[in-house]
Regions:
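Hydrophobic, glycine- and aromatic-enriched re-entrant/interface helices and adjoining loop segments
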Residues: 200-297
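Interfacial segments of multi-pass membrane proteins
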Residues: 176, 180-195, 273-297, 356-368
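Structural signal for the C-terminal ends of transmembrane alpha-helices
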Residues: 57-68, 130-138, 183-192, 307-316, ...
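Hydrophobic alpha-helical transmembrane segments
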Residues: 50-58, 121, 292-312
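Loop-to-helix entry and N-terminal half of a specific, functionally important transmembrane alpha helix
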Residues: 314-353
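Hydrophobic alpha-helical segments of polytopic membrane proteins
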Residues: 75-76, 153-165, 172-223
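A juxtamembrane structural motif centered on a specific transmembrane helix
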Residues: 1-8, 30, 342-343, 347-394
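Membrane-helix boundary/helix-loop-helix interface segments in multi-pass membrane proteins
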Residues: 2-4, 28-29, 37-46, 50, ...
Length: 394
């Protein structure tokens, strides 16, 4: 009993408080969004309460595991996650592996419901890439361009195969989350700056060329380049770049812009949102918040997210070992991309992707994955405090 009390005292109270605010906001926003009548008698708010209860239990379990043990478990967790993605790929469409909106991303279990392996694989990739960097740095104390290039090669070797499988589901958004996590870990790994510039320069150059072609030669962009994409990707690009011209493809973008704009500064009030957005309790929950809470509440939520990210960075910066620092960096990368992509698509700055707003959107797999990541953060904080305590005693 005393051990449990000591463990709870070691948890980062500020991070827990921020998560509690997001928890309450999520449940309230989901409850309000389901009042529009499109969901029948389904109570997603109650389900989200259950999801959060389970999520906090998962958080505490992971937070109680030492970082050294997590590092040792990196390979087994990765292998289990990779195998689950392979199984999902090879099994035919069925009630166990359903195809929803043209994508086969889930296992559907009795009672438990749908589970998305790619969501949980984020943690496996975070753990293994961070562990790989730590071991590589210990092996090659004298850093050279060749050793840094070898490190990137190792990371690509364990990242590309699962990323390709996830991309084929199709789930492009999840692949970008993997890339964000890996990029942040590589950035903090201590590799030479010229290699970072080289790695960052390639996608920036490609993006710049695409923007130039879009502005100067729109016919080539739409008739030659966009047509190279898959049909669902073409639809999202067209709906993003000109939602009012391509009304079918850009319907969700139109409606979310209408919801955000109609909220004004103070909002319409709780439960008074009347703009219809398909599945607004999931990826478009921020539109509900902006419509009913207005600019004031929307800005408050954005500030809470920045507080969360800054708290994780502080914990990562004060971590007692490189492994903990790299985990924090990777998690910040994942959350930042989710945050900016989701809010960006709500206000029309980014294309619509199946990326949930972390801790606010309804969903079990996404929330559980994020809470497990917070458990990793708290484990880093706990380990650091234990380290400091032992030094003081010595």
């Amino acid at each position: 009993m005393v051990g449990k009390i000591v463990f709870l005292k070691k948890l980062d109270k500020k991070l827990i408080f921020i998560l509690f605010i997001l928890c309450v906001t999520s449940i309230v926003a989901i409850y309000s969004s389901q009042q529009t009548g499109q969901y029948g008698n389904q109570n997603f708010a109650m389900k989200q309460m259950v999801n959060y209860a389970i999520g906090f239990v998962l958080l505490l379990i992971v937070a109680n595991i030492d970082l050294d043990q997590l590092q040792k478990l990196a390979w087994p967790i990765y292998i289990v996650g990779f195998i689950s993605i392979i199984i999902l790929k090879v099994l035919p469409v069925s009630s166990f592996t359903p195809e929803i909106s043209g994508a086969k991303r889930w296992f559907r279990f009795p009672i438990i419901g749908a589970t998305q392996p790619a969501e949980f694989f984020k943690l496996a990739l975070l753990l293994l890439v961070a562990s790989l960097v730590v071991k590589h740095n210990a092996q090659y104390m004298a850093r050279t361009f060749q050793t840094d290039l070898l490190l990137i090669g190792k990371i690509f070797l364990i990242s590309i195969p699962p990323a390709l499988l996830v991309y084929s589901q199709p789930d492009t958004g999840m692949v970008f989350l993997y890339i964000a996590a890996i990029a942040c870990i590589i950035f903090m790994s201590g590799i030479q700056k010229k290699l970072i510039v080289l790695c960052a320069g390639i996608p920036i150059t490609v993006l710049s060329v695409l923007i130039f072609i879009y502005v100067k030669y729109p016919d080539i962009f739409f008739n030659k380049l966009v047509t190279l994409l898959k049909p669902h990707q073409q639809s999202r690009i067209l709906g993003w770049l000109d939602p009012f011209q391509h009304t079918d493809q850009g319907y969700q973008t139109q409606q979310s812009l209408l919801a955000v704009g109609s909220g004004g500064v103070e909002g319409k009030g709780f439960g008074s949102g009347n703009v219809y957005i398909p599945e607004k309790h999931t990826d478009f929950i921020f539109a509900t918040i902006a419509e009913e809470g207005g600019f004031i509440v929307a800005t408050f939520i954005i500030c809470i997210f920045f507080l969360l990210l800054s708290r994780i960075l502080i914990i990562g910066n004060s971590a007692g070992n490189l492994f903990g620092t790299l985990l924090c960096a990777g998690i910040v990368g994942v959350l930042m991309l989710q945050f900016f992509q989701n809010i960006g698509m709500i206000v029309g700055l980014m294309p619509v992707k199946g990326i949930a707003l972390p801790f606010l959107s309804y969903g079990g797999s996404s929330l559980f994955s994020n809470m497990l990541m917070m458990g990793l953060i708290l484990s880093t904080r706990k380990t650091y405090k234990e380290y400091m305590f032992s030094v003081n005693q010595h």
